[in-house]
């Protein structure tokens, strides 16, 4: 665990207690060419560096979890390079992905993945430790999620971790007592058959009052027109992010394509960071 980075992250967060951070699902493979220094992640490094006051929680996911090899960094030089570069920034927490599959993944499988994420800290060639666990596809099964989170905290021991629970929708308030961050909305901007993002209406409906600093909003496919006909341009992006900041929502992320693109405009990773700074 990169303790100096944690201290820096805490300092940055305290210095801007009402700041809205970036919760980035970094589902982009780190490299375009083997061992190229994780060039595919360079836009993230640039955005993090350009906005040191913005806290980041960056979710990494080699293969629906810590990877197939069972080894730290998934025994992949490109992930080792990318994660070690993320860990060099004091305003970044690197978070490991696990899939709960709506509480149908076996607890043994979940615990195995959590343990493998912890073991990334044993790699001696670079700092690739993760600072927390991202529980994807969380659902309303308190005992299941509480057991997984309790195991995660015990596994990481004296190293404090961040637990992120991705409900993607309204979650009962009790989950805010066990999850450090609850994703209360995840959907596209205005896709047919999917929940629409409606700015303040969505925030008020999906986040229990008083829990805004522990909540996150993620909007993908920010393109075309919004629910009210507004064009998904840089101005609307700034408006939506400013509303989240004004409401003291703890975390946000918008992207104009899927999670496999961080440079498609207008909601590039750099623009999101700039608007939240």
Task: Please report, for each region that a protein language model flagged, where it lies by residue.
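Glycan-processing catalytic domains of CAZymes
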Residues: 17-277
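Fungal secretory targeting signals
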Residues: 1-19
